[in-house]
Structure formats: structure tokens, C-alpha cells
């Protein structure tokens, strides 16, 4: 329970607002972001959520992207120093050739600070998605969860993280 109620405690608006604000957070990408001919990450300013010290969260996201089969895409989440996570995405593997490809479940990553996933592109104009879910435990300091993306292989085409991509966290303790 985020804010346990104690016998004799006054229940105030501030108490309830804090409980509600910290229980579930969701952010979405407001505009398309573009990377062209670079493998350097660009962090989204929309897909950022503050994480509390000593808290644990379930994590889920859905990232829509558009890229070529040459460039593919890599997406990462960066966590506060000392945070640990178990997150695994469902996505298309690299080397795909059409939108009807087998689903690729990547291995669960027991990672601290940064999680990175690579997913395949088909052709410019073909939207694809990557769907990570998992657990985040902030054992150290508070900080932000931030989503970034880049081309996996530099290519002179646009790789887009599409508007409507989203992340959501539910605090469990």
C-alpha cells in the first residue's frame, strides 16, 4: 500500500492526492521523432516518468516505429542509478521482410540502469511495434525513467518513433 492509513490519522486531500498521483503514471509520445543516418540515441522529452527511491513498479509500453530493413531500430529505457529491472519485449526480429513475421520474444534482461532492445524494420511507411513489459525496482536514488531510440545500423533514411507510443508504470510498493 503506497500510503497506509493508521488508526487516528486525519485523512486529508493531500494524503489522497499523493496516493493517487504515485499509483499509476502514463506518458505518450506527442509527435513523431526522427533519426537519420545515426546510431546515436535521441531521448524523448515526452516519454519520461519520475521514479521514487525505494519503490517498485510494473512497467509496460508500446512503441510504434517506422524504419527500413537496413536501419532497424533500437529502443532503450534509462533508469536512475542503482535501479534494477526485469523487462522483456515482444517485437519483430531483425532481418524481417514483411509485416506478417513471427513474433520475437527477447530474453528477460536482468539489468540495472539501461535496457536496450533491437527490432526489425520492413520498409519506410510500414509501421511496426515493440511491446516491453516487466518490473522495475528503484533500490537507490530517485530519478527518471527515460525512453530513447536510434537506428540500429546507420542508414540515410528516416527512422521514426511514432506519435502515440506510450509507457505506463504502476507502483506496487
Language-model features, listed with the residues they occupy:
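Acidic, negatively charged sequence signal
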Residues: 1-4
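Surface-exposed molecular-recognition determinants
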Residues: 8, 17-173
Amino acid at each position: 500500500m503506497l500510503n497506509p492509513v493508521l488508526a487516528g490519522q486525519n485523512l486529508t486531500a493531500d494524503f489522497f492526492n499523493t496516493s493517487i498521483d504515485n499509483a499509476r503514471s502514463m506518458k505518450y509520445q506527442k509527435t513523431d521523432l526522427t533519426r537519420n543516418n545515426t546510431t546515436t540515441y535521441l531521448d524523448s522529452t515526452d516519454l519520461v516518468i519520475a521514479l521514487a527511491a525505494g519503490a517498485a513498479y510494473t512497467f509496460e509500453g508500446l512503441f510504434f516505429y517506422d524504419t527500413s530493413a537496413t536501419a532497424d531500430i533500437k529502443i532503450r529505457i534509462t533508469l536512475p542509478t542503482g535501479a534494477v529491472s526485469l523487462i522483456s519485449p515482444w517485437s519483430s526480429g531483425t532481418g524481417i521482410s514483411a509485416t506478417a513475421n513471427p513474433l520475437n520474444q527477447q530474453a528477460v534482461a536482468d539489468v540495472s540502469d539501461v535496457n536496450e532492445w533491437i527490432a526489425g524494420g520492413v520498409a519506410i511507411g510500414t509501421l511496426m511495434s515493440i511491446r516491453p513489459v516487466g518490473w522495475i525496482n528503484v533500490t537507490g536514488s530517485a530519478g527518471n525513467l527515460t525512453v530513447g531510440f536510434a537506428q540500429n545500423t546507420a542508414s540515410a533514411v528516416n527512422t521514426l518513433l511514432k506519435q502515440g507510443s506510450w509507457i505506463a508504470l504502476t507502483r506496487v510498493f
